[in-house]
């Protein structure tokens, strides 16, 4: 769906004609999708008085000059100058009776009349509201947005303020089109013919700009996402510098590679080196090698990289000028974070709390009645309001990631290597095949297809009759991505090999064992271990806390006597040879002779062999010192307890991953090997990334494309509409009371089959009925135990039934409920929920887990937290979930993928990789 690209605050209109563009004009162009011009937060009004950001630097001087002449209050006469966050939560944004034009909240009236009569009804409504009423007087507004034209001018005169126009101008008083209005008129901003004359320039104070931005947001998802990534990027300066450094690294790798390949005369170097001729680097550089030596194909790709770098620089400029500056202004004046350095210490929970205090200052999120006589005025429907609490903010930021988490955990994506995998080659398995490269391609193909430009799910996916057509389109999208990856594969492989070499060489030189011995979680493990609605910084912190316990658990298992003894032998021999060479080099060193340059073999000096044997000694010594035998771990020490089972359970407190298949086997090597597939060696992950560049085209063509129908079905069946939030993933709503209708139908169908099979087998004897009752009680007790944070060890003690396949399906659905419970409990912990709330949730979850096995009633609203309600609590929402897909609300949008382009998708996913 194309979006209008509104003018930013720093743009000016043409001097003649209508200086402002029509809001209905389609500005979705190729360049706008690349540079992000269509991704702004609010659409400014047609008659809004624009200003020049270049004069913002004089704002403090103007305030100082005006304060010396008159003590003017920016927040209305007679009101205290208090911080916005300290004001009342139900503050009124409407103008006072003396302000013109008045801001009227959108009424609720039945659209039963013809469209031609709507304007007359609005005019009658506005006329009636402008007349004096006998109803109780309105409350005095606690906040009033002044007009910048009337506050600051060149002559320094201050005049009466007026309210800036809100986004919804349909229910505002019609603006006057009198072009002869004086500059001092309080309604001057409504005139489309106003121009700057006689050198008069107007500016809007930064705080009012931030308030206007917040009051007129139309894309809450994008604004909150940018707000979060600004917090995660630690401020504007760090974000800009990081982007510039990334581009400089790219330029250096390209330039340095081209110089080493075509810029040096290696033949001249080797010929003169053998003859001991004195040469310098200037003698080896080929003049004009870019023109004469570089092949035409390489020049073509270099030109493409140059265009890409230029586009990235232009994109960075627009992001800085139109996004980062506005976000910085918002943090400074509304979130009350004056310095970006504070973002390094402040918690996200605090930012969410301060953001929630602003909900009454936005027409989309405000739920406060602004008039005492509320019955005499039209008010907005609260059910359509945009929700704004910790859960809603996380759902908006993680809307796409929640679907990806569910796709990986439910094994919807088939990424197996069965046609290519060799049993003797176990470097790449089905879990390690998901690399960053493949992950980026999957996001590029799925997210840009399933979601529109507004961040919402495309309505066509939610309709069952579009399933086959959409599956074909997604299949074609996967195959197109495979072709592009196959064409670019040689160049991407060379680039990443050089990138990894330059990045890790210094680390390898200083600590050779760091590359061979360090472990980290694989990309597959990151999606498998991530909870729903878990923001990236929470997830990264949780994984970092698990690194130490995970290493301790792995080191408890012996690697094998052959490997340990062989490494001890290599360590001793390499250390002995290196020691002799170093001693001889120090002993025979004088002015005439240098043992360091002595050639032990032809062309190889002593220093070469010292570096080789030193590397072997460092690697083997580190490996043997951290070997996982009981002797090396010193069991006599009081700080060590050799208990792999307890260690793995401690690791699961951070990873939240302890599948039931591991129960009773936590001490075995098989479980340790399965865990090592998730927590693998860093060198293996790097090799997998390089091999994945070659395998990605085949996986996309043969495997991912075959899952197109399952992906479409997943988005249709596991999408829930929430009023004020839109369509979100079912598992992200933490709805434990009931499952979705589609899920419930499949689960009841499988349970019905298992019950019928058990009845047929137990109808002969009454003793078997007793066994089945015990079985059902065990299943119920299992569901209650699985509602806890850690997995129950008694899950594997269930009696074995003949219908193992249906039991496995039931356990799979049970695991999804369990993961939702874990995600919800960790969500409460991350945002500092009280113990009383946690106890209430635990008590509810026990009942819900008990009833979820035999529940067949219609779906009901999601879990409501017990306890006193607080409008400003982080978790104060009870969602009204609408499971019915209303076709009237599902307007046919642009076919997915038609207007997003490759470069536009690259721009969309670039900010998701910041901070990785």
UniProtKB/Swiss-Prot annotation:
Taxonomy, superkingdom: Eukaryota
Keywords associated with the record: Autophagy, Cytoplasmic vesicle, Endoplasmic reticulum, Golgi apparatus, Lipid transport, Membrane, Phosphoprotein, Transmembrane, Transmembrane helix, Transport
Intramembrane region list: 482-502, 682-702
Pfam families: ATG9 (PF04109)
Biased composition regions of type Low complexity, renumbered to the chain: 92-105
Membrane topology summary: Multi-pass membrane protein
Residue spans, topological domain Cytoplasmic: 1-238, 315-481, 503-568, 627-681, 703-916
Sequence ranges on the Lumenal membrane side: 260-293, 590-605
Gene Ontology annotations for the cellular component aspect, listed alphabetically: autophagosome; cytoplasmic vesicle membrane; endoplasmic reticulum membrane; Golgi membrane; phagophore assembly site membrane
Reaction catalyzed: a 1,2-diacyl-sn-glycero-3-phosphocholine(in) = a 1,2-diacyl-sn-glycero-3-phosphocholine(out); a 1,2-diacyl-sn-glycero-3-phospho-L-serine(in) = a 1,2-diacyl-sn-glycero-3-phospho-L-serine(out); a 1,2-diacyl-sn-glycero-3-phosphoethanolamine(in) = a 1,2-diacyl-sn-glycero-3-phosphoethanolamine(out); a 1,2-diacyl-sn-glycero-3-phospho-(1D-myo-inositol-3-phosphate)(in) = a 1,2-diacyl-sn-glycero-3-phospho-(1D-myo-inositol-3-phosphate)(out)
This protein's record includes keyword Secreted: no
Transmembrane residue ranges: 239-259, 294-314, 569-589, 606-626
Biased composition range(s): Basic residues: 750-762
Post-translational modification remark: Phosphorylated by ATG1. ATG1 phosphorylation is required for preautophagosome elongation.
UniProt main location, coarse: membrane
Composition bias, Polar residues: 1-11
Acidic residues composition-biased segments: 115-124
GO biological process, any: reticulophagy
Region named Disordered: 1-27, 86-150, 747-814
InterPro entries for the chain: Autophagy-rel_prot_9
Subcellular location: Preautophagosomal structure membrane; Cytoplasmic vesicle membrane; Golgi apparatus membrane; Endoplasmic reticulum membrane
Entry text on domains: Forms a homotrimer with a solvated central pore, which is connected laterally to the cytosol through the cavity within each protomer. Acts as a lipid scramblase that uses its central pore to function: the central pore opens laterally to accommodate lipid headgroups, thereby enabling lipid flipping and redistribution of lipids added to the outer leaflet of ATG9-containing vesicles, thereby enabling growth into autophagosomes.
Function: Phospholipid scramblase involved in autophagy and cytoplasm to vacuole transport (Cvt) vesicle formation. Cycles between the preautophagosomal structure/phagophore assembly site (PAS) and the cytoplasmic vesicle pool and supplies membrane for the growing autophagosome. Lipid scramblase activity plays a key role in preautophagosomal structure/phagophore assembly by distributing the phospholipids that arrive through ATG2 from the cytoplasmic to the luminal leaflet of the bilayer, thereby driving autophagosomal membrane expansion. Required for mitophagy.
The protein's name: Autophagy-related protein 9
């Amino acid at each position: 769906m194309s979006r209008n690209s509104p003018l930013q605050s720093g743009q000016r209109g043409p001097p003649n004609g209508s200086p402002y563009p029509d809001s209905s004009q389609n500005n979705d162009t190729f360049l706008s999708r690349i540079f992000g011009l269509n991704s702004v937060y609010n659409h400014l009004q047609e008659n809004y008085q624009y200003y020049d950001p270049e004069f913002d630097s004089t704002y403090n001087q103007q305030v100082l000059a005006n304060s010396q002449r008159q003590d003017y209050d920016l927040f209305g006469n007679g009101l205290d100058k208090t911080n916005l966050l300290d004001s009342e939560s139900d503050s009124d944004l409407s103008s006072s009776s003396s302000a013109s034009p008045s801001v009227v909240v959108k009424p609720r009236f039945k659209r039963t009349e013809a469209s031609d009569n709507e304007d007359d009804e609005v005019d009658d409504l506005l006329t009636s509201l402008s007349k004096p009423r006998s109803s109780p007087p309105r409350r005095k507004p606690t906040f009033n947005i002044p007009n910048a034209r009337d506050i600051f001018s060149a002559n320094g005169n201050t005049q009466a303020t007026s309210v800036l126009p809100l986004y919804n101008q349909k229910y505002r008083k019609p603006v006057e089109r009198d072009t002869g209005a004086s500059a001092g008129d309080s309604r001057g901003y409504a005139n489309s013919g106003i121009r700057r004359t006689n050198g008069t320039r107007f500016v809007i104070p930064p705080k009012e700009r931030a308030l206007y931005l917040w009051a007129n947001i139309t894309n809450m998802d994008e604004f909150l996402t940018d707000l979060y990534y600004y917090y995660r990027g630690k401020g504007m300066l760090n974000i800009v510098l990081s982007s510039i450094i990334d581009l400089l690294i790219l330029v250096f790798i390209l330039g340095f590679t081209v110089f080493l390949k075509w810029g040096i005369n290696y033949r001249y170097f080797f010929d003169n080196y053998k003859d001991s001729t004195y040469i310098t680097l200037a003698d080896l550089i080929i003049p004009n090698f870019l023109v004469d030596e570089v092949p035409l194909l390489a020049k073509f790709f270099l030109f493409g990289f140059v265009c890409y770098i230029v586009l990235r620089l232009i994109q960075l400029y627009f992001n800085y000028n139109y996004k980062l500056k506005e976000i910085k202004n918002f943090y400074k004046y509304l979130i009350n974070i004056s310095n970006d350095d504070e973002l390094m210490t402040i918690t996200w929970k605090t930012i969410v709390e301060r953001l929630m205090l602003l909900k009454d200052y936005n027409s989309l999120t405000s739920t406060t009645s602004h008039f005492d006589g509320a019955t005499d005025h039209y008010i907005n429907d609260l059910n359509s309001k945009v929700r704004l609490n910790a859960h809603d903010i996380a759902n908006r930021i993680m809307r796409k990631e929640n679907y990806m988490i569910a796709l990986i955990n439910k094994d919807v994506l088939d990424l197996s290597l069965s046609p290519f995998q060799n049993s003797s080659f176990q470097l790449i398995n089905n879990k390690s095949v998901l690399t960053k490269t493949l992950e980026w391609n999957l996001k590029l193909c799925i997210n840009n297809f399933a979601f529109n430009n507004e961040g919402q799910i495309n309505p066509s996916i939610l309709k069952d009759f579009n399933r086959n057509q959409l599956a074909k389109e997604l299949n074609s999208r996967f195959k197109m991505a495979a072709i592009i990856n196959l064409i670019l594969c040689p160049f991407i492989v060379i680039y990443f090999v050089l990138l990894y070499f330059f990045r890790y060489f210094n680390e390898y030189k200083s600590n050779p064992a760091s590359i061979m011995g360090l472990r980290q979680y694989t990309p597959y493990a990151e999606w498998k271990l991530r909870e729903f609605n878990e923001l990236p910084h929470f997830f990264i912190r949780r994984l970092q806390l698990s690194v130490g316990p995970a290493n301790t658990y792995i080191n408890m298992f012996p690697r094998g006597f052959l490997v340990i003894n062989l490494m001890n032998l290599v360590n001793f021999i390499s250390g002995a040879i290196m020691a002799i060479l170093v001693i001889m080099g120090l002993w025979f060193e004088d002015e005439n002779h240098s043992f360091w340059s002595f050639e032990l073999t032809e062309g190889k000096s002593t220093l070469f062999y010292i570096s080789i044997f030193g590397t072997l000694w460092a690697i083997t010594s580190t490996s043997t010192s951290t070997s996982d035998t009981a002797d090396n771990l010193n069991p006599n020490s009081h700080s060590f307890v050799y208990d792999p089972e307890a260690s793995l359970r401690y690791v699961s407190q951070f990873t939240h991953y302890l599948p039931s298949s591991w129960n009773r086997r936590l001490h075995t090597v098989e479980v340790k090997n399965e865990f090592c597939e998730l927590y693998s060696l860093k060198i293996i992950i790097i090799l997998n990334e390089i091999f994945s560049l070659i395998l990605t085209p085949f996986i996309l063509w043969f495997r991912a494309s075959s899952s197109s129908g399952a992906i479409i079905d997943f988005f249709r069946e596991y999408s829930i509409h929430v009023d004020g939030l839109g369509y979100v993933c079912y598992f992200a709503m933490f709805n434990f009371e009931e499952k979705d209708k589609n899920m419930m139908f499949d689960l009841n169908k499988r349970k019905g089959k298992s019950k019928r099979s058990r009845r047929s087998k137990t109808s002969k004897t009454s003793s078997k009925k007793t066994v089945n009752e015990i079985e059902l009680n065990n299943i119920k007790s299992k569901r209650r135990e699985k509602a806890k944070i850690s997995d129950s060890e008694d899950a594997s003690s269930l009696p074995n039934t003949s219908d193992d396949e249906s039991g496995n399906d039931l356990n799979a659905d049970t695991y999804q409920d369990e993961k939702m419970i874990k995600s919800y409990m960790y969500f409460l912990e991350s945002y500092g929920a009280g113990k009383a709330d946690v106890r209430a949730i635990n008590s509810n979850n026990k009942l819900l887990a008990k009833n979820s096995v035999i529940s067949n009633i219609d779906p009901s609203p999601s879990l409501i937290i017990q306890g006193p309600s607080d409008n400003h609590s982080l978790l104060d929402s009870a969602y009204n979930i609408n499971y019915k897909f209303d076709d009237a609300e599902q307007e046919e949008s642009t076919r997915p993928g038609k207007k997003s382009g490759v470069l536009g998708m690259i721009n969309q996913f670039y900010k998701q990789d910041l901070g990785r």
